[in-house]
Every structure is written in structure tokens, then in C-alpha cells.
Amino acid sequence: MKDLVAKRYVKALIDGRNSESINTISNKLNQVASAFADERFNSIISSPEISDKSKVDLIISFVDGTDNSLNNFIKLLGEKRRLDLLPFIAKDLNIQLAKMNNNYIGVVYTNQELSSDYISSIEKQFSKKFDVKLSLSQNVCDYDGIKVDIDGLGVEISFSKDRLKSQLIDHILKAV
């Protein structure tokens, strides 16, 4: 539910701005969103004993030196008691900024460490295939095969040993 509300705020932040100002706003909101990782900060923001104005002033102190539009945006969120949406707004704004810049981040899931040359070759091939700038990170887990997940593009490509075995067995049984 918070994601849906955050998307509307992100759309409002993006409308009528150039990519440079959107990038500046995104960086400032990422600073604020990182503060939400602290438990004490969350308790301050969610506390009913602390006034909304004090909460807004605290958050604005993180983003001092920006234009008035970001300050007014944070004040609006404070008036509507939606300051807890800031991490979701920052995340969605990063996704929209990546789409605008045609720059995406993906994850390669494997059960063993792959060399950086292999990861970069996968990056280059997928970048050429989808005509985007792509950076891949690796996640070593218990997945028996290899899976590439590019979230912003909605692409998930996987090769599983178990699936290959079952398809091979099915093919042999059909041939007999």
C-alpha cells in the first residue's frame, strides 16, 4: 500500500524537472532514507509525543542546502503524517531515475563464486541485447544453476540443472 502512495509522490517530484535536479533530489532523499535504518530515528518519527513540526525540522536538517521545493515536499509529508513514506519514495525515485538514464542494476544468483570477467561478459551481452547500461552484482546462494534477475526491466533468465535433467528425461521417454 505504501508503495502505491509513494509512486504518486514520485510522479509529482519528477514532473517538470530536468534530470539533474531529479538526481539532486534523489541523493538528498537517499540520505534521509538511510536514517530510517536507525531504530532510534524510527522511534522519533513514529512517536505521537513529538510534534509533527519537530519531526519535519529534524528531516529538513538532513537536507539543508537544497531548494525550497524539497523542503516544501517534506513539510507536506509532515502535514499529511506520511513521513514514514520517505524510504519508499527514495527507492521509487531511484528506479524512475534509472529508467530515465537507461541504467539498470541486476543480480546474478549462483551456488558458487563466478569470476569478475564472467560477470562483466554477462553484463556486456545483456547490455547489448536490451540496449541499456547494466551493472550486475553476484549473490552466492543455494540455487543449483544460474539466474540473472534485472528488476527494473522485469527480466529474469535462469538455467537450472534440475530443470534440464527433467526435460532431458521427458524427451527420452517421448522418444521411446
Curated annotation (Swiss-Prot):
Record's keyword terms, sorted: ATP synthesis, Cell inner membrane, Cell membrane, CF(1), Hydrogen ion transport, Ion transport, Membrane, Transport
Which domain of life, per UniProt?
Bacteria
Q: What is the lineage of its organism?
A: Bacteria, Pseudomonadati, Campylobacterota, Epsilonproteobacteria, Campylobacterales
Supply the Pfam families for this chain: OSCP
UniProt lists the gene as atpH
Mind telling me which InterPro entries this protein's record contains?
A: ATP_synth_OSCP/delta_N_sf, ATPase_OSCP/dsu
Assembly and partners are described as:
F-type ATPases have 2 components, F(1) - the catalytic core - and F(0) - the membrane proton channel. F(1) has five subunits: alpha(3), beta(3), gamma(1), delta(1), epsilon(1). F(0) has three main subunits: a(1), b(2) and c(10-14). The alpha and beta chains form an alternating ring which encloses part of the gamma chain. F(1) is attached to F(0) by a central stalk formed by the gamma and epsilon chains, while a peripheral stalk is formed by the delta and b chains.
This entry carries the following GO cellular component terms, namely:
plasma membrane; proton-transporting ATP synthase complex
Write the protein's name. Answer: ATP synthase subunit delta
Q: What does this protein do?
A: F(1)F(0) ATP synthase produces ATP from ADP in the presence of a proton or sodium gradient. F-type ATPases consist of two structural domains, F(1) containing the extramembraneous catalytic core and F(0) containing the membrane proton channel, linked together by a central stalk and a peripheral stalk. During catalysis, ATP synthesis in the catalytic domain of F(1) is coupled via a rotary mechanism of the central stalk subunits to proton translocation. This protein is part of the stalk that links CF(0) to CF(1). It either transmits conformational changes from CF(0) to CF(1) or is implicated in proton conduction.
| Subcellular location field | Cell inner membrane
Q: What would be an example GO MF term here?
A: proton-transporting ATP synthase activity, rotational mechanism
The family this protein is said to belong to:
Belongs to the ATPase delta chain family.
What is the protein's membrane topology class? Peripheral membrane protein
